[in-house]
């Protein structure tokens, strides 16, 4: 059900949960209706597969022919949302219906790929976003009678969350829990499946997860204090997630200092100074 964006978005509409306006794109004769009712700029996404920016196109009237005939019926069109930033939440539902949630995590994407995730319960709007996200994801898991870990990605627009996508599994944006929480998302998934007692999920300290993308392994990463390296052992390819580094510390200034040192050892430098907010 959730592997198909058509049935996933249909579920969100059925539950009356906020998401971007959308439609199933069946044939090229729909374009006039799409631009009128969905939006003047839309994001066309494959119904199945496609991730990290693959299988997605930003379409306006000027480039609608980029969607070739073989794609119709296999894609949906969503309104392009000029969001403020992106967040996600990872939670789990147990067999008895109980649920546990991690704090909402802030995410930075570059070229459609998650670069890093930041968790800090002192962020502005954190409390209101947490309430919204838990309610939305909880309704979805209850409707599906789901057992295990599920992630929900959202756009933030003002003080509202719009659901972007659901992932019925452990999630890249939840990797920070391996160092920043007493119970990781992997352990939480097992606890839910085995119906084991589980306390509330309290973060140890502010945390950042940095994805290692399209780069060879660098032993110097191990010199980063207050960190934990996870290397996947995959073949190195451009744009491929090959590992990640978690950094956790009570003082955000310390985290930023380590990130600034670390970014010079990565192929695509990212500025972390805005994390001071």
What residue ranges belong to the model's regions?
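Short amphipathic alpha-helices in soluble, non-transmembrane regions
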Residues: 256-264
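Short beta-strand-to-loop capping motifs
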Residues: 59-61, 93, 212-214, 247-250
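Active-site nucleotide/adenylate-binding loops and adjacent lid/helix of ATP-dependent enzymes
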Residues: 2-88, 92-140, 263
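Active-site "cap" helix and flanking loop/linker of ATP-utilizing ligase/carboxylase catalytic domains
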Residues: 131-152, 157, 168-215
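Conserved small/polar residues in nucleotide/adenosyl-binding loops
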Residues: 273-277
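Glycine-rich active-site loop/lid that clamps phosphate-bearing ligands
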Residues: 203-206, 210-237
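Protein kinase-like catalytic core scaffold
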Residues: 100, 150, 161-165
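An anion-binding loop in the catalytic cleft
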Residues: 238-249
């Amino acid at each position: 059900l959730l592997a198909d964006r058509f049935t996933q978005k249909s579920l969100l509409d059925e539950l009356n949960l906020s998401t971007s306006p959308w439609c199933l794109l069946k044939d090229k004769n729909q374009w006039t209706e799409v631009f009128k009712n969905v939006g003047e700029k839309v994001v066309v996404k494959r119904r199945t597969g496609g991730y990290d920016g693959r299988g997605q196109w930003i379409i306006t009237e000027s480039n609608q022919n980029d969607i070739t005939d073989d794609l119709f019926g296999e894609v949906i069109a969503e309104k392009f949302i000029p969001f403020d930033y992106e967040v996600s939440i990872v939670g789990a539902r147990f067999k008895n219906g109980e649920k546990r949630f991690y704090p909402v995590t802030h995410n930075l994407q570059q070229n459609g790929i998650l670069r890093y995730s930041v968790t800090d319960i002192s962020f502005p709007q954190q409390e209101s976003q947490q309430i919204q996200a838990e309610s939305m994801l909880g309704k979805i898991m209850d409707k599906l009678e789901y057992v295990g870990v599920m992630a929900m990605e959202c756009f933030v627009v003002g003080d509202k969350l719009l659901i972007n996508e659901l992932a019925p599994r452990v999630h890249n944006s939840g990797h920070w829990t391996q160092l920043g929480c007493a119970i990781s998302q992997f352990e939480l998934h097992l606890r839910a499946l085995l119906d084991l007692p589980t306390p509330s999920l309290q973060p140890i300290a502010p945390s950042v997860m940095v994805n290692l993308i399209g780069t060879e392994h660098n032993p110097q990463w191990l010199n980063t204090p207050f960190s934990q390296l996870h290397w996947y052992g995959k073949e190195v390819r451009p744009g491929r997630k090959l590992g990640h580094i978690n950094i956790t510390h009570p003082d955000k200034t310390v985290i930023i200092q380590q990130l600034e040192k670390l970014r010079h050892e990565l192929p695509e430098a990212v500025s972390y100074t805005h994390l001071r907010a």
